[in-house]
Amino acid sequence: MRISVSVVASNVVVDNDLISLDVGGEMTLADLKAVIQSDINIAPAAQSLFHNNQLLTDDSKTLSQIGVVPGDMLGMHIRVPGRELAGSQGSANPSARTTQESLARRQQALPDPETLRLHMLGDPRVYETVRMQNPQLAAAARDSRLFREVLSAQQRAEADAEAAKEAKIAMLNADPFNLDAQREIEDIIRQNAVSENLHNAMEFSPEVFGRVTMLYIPAEVNSHKVKAFVDSGAQVTIMSPECAAACNIMHLVDRRYSGVAKGVGTASILGRVHLAHIKIDDLFLPCSFTVMEGKHIDLLLGLDMLKRYQACIDLKDNVLRIRDRNVPFLHEADLPKHQDEFANEPLIHGRGGALIGGRTGAVTHPAGNPGSLAQNAQTLPARANLAAPVGTPSSSTAPGRNPHSPSRWPAESISKITDIGFTREQAIQALDAANGDLEGAIGYLI
């Protein structure tokens, strides 16, 4: 089985603070420490291992007896005798010393700022990606002196944040048997695992950060051309009131079927058109439409229509197969105009500096700071075609808001969101991003 060992505190420098090991359930704790020694050259006597906030003291127990299962992460404190004095001598200003060391490491890893600036200006793809991730740095690219100042300021801010994190870990490890401290250490270990998972996704599966276009086909209803959204997750076929009026079938709406649709939010159902013909390719197919407000989509082909005519969504050939006809899905350039709104959708400031799309929920800038954007610029040509860039400058801050400040949105909408467990501030931010659309606001928050 594979487990991980995270070095959460150490009075010596180790080559790797996160170790992945293949071990057996019958391996003893002493054997595990020997394996760790072979990886990072730390003697077993200096290793203190923790599992589920419990210090492991019996080296004769096997991993199975301890309760270690595949995928577990153990915490490890390293205390090498004779090193505490050296550490205390330099502890007069540990935060400043750590900041300087971190800044020096970053500067060594980065190329010369002028080389980096010229690289950005020489490759439009790199410049555009940096502009989306770090507008301040991109805006300074035309001025060599200003670029150097902005880059240095961002590096110092990142180094300060890293130093503060290391200082917090050191403070927590000052009392390793404090339960509250151990809970915080466990949370730090979890966050490190999340960051590692993000980096692995960026390296091995960058396509997961891309933007997927929805499936539309050309159709006609009552001789009116419409772009129909194919949605096998919808129970019924839905049409907007505007589209029904344009198709001249609004007078056929049976309002006895009106009501409220509940799901992620609510929408008003005006009624039902029991029978109308929809033209797909050269086929004229009888269809019923539920006329519903609150949707950006003119026509949505639901499961009732798809199952009735045994339609097949073929993603390999990018076609909808229906009655022996192959109807190609529309290309991105041919999608309805309202889809363009998502390209310039408003952004909401999340925790840790994350920027999140107010409508799609796509994370434009992940929380935290996995690395300097300037440092990542060297690898941007390989990722320049990604729709959703990754990384964010540490200077991103969420604007403050008084939780009881007046809002331009109806109190009823805010109340509906707060009733399901969110704060008033979150409700107002979500409504701002969704331009007052209650369903979109709830969808983002969920």
UniProtKB/Swiss-Prot annotation:
Describe the family membership recorded for this protein in Swiss-Prot or TrEMBL.
Answer: Belongs to the DDI1 family.
Every copy of the Ubiquitin-like domain together lies at 1-83
* Location (main, coarse): cytoplasm
Organism lineage: Eukaryota, Fungi, Dikarya, Ascomycota, Pezizomycotina
- One function term, GO molecular function aspect: aspartic-type endopeptidase activity
PROSITE patterns the UniProt entry points to: UBA, UBIQUITIN_2
List all disulphide bridges recorded for this chain. Answer: none
Instruction: Give the subcellular location.
Output: Cytoplasm
Give the region (Disordered) as residue ranges.
387-412
Output the GO biological process annotations, alphabetical, semicolon-separated: protein transport; proteolysis
Keywords in alphabetical order: Aspartyl protease, Cytoplasm, Hydrolase, Protease, Protein transport, Transport
Per UniProt, residues of the UBA domain are: 408-446
- What InterPro entries does its record include? DDI1_N, Peptidase_aspartic_DDI1-type, Peptidase_aspartic_dom_sf, UBA, UBA-like_sf, Ubiquitin-like_dom, Ubiquitin-like_domsf
Q: How does it assemble?
A: Binds ubiquitin and polyubiquitinated proteins.
Q: What does this protein do?
A: Probable aspartic protease. May be involved in the regulation of exocytosis. Acts as a linker between the 19S proteasome and polyubiquitinated proteins via UBA domain interactions with ubiquitin for their subsequent degradation. Required for S-phase checkpoint control.
Q: What is its EC number?
A: 3.4.23.-
Name the UniProt record assigns to this protein: DNA damage-inducible protein 1
Q: Which GO terms describe its cellular component?
A: cytoplasm
Active site at D231
- Note the PANTHER family from the entry: DNA DAMAGE INDUCIBLE 1 HOMOLOG 2, SODIUM-GLUCOSE COTRANSPORTER REGULATORY PROTEIN -RELATED
Please name the SUPFAM superfamilies in this protein's record: Acid proteases (SSF50630), UBA-like (SSF46934), Ubiquitin-like (SSF54236)
Which organism is this entry from? Coccidioides immitis (strain RS) (Valley fever fungus)
Root EC class: hydrolase
- Top-level taxon: Eukaryota
Q: Which SMART domains match?
A: UBA (SM00165), UBQ (SM00213)
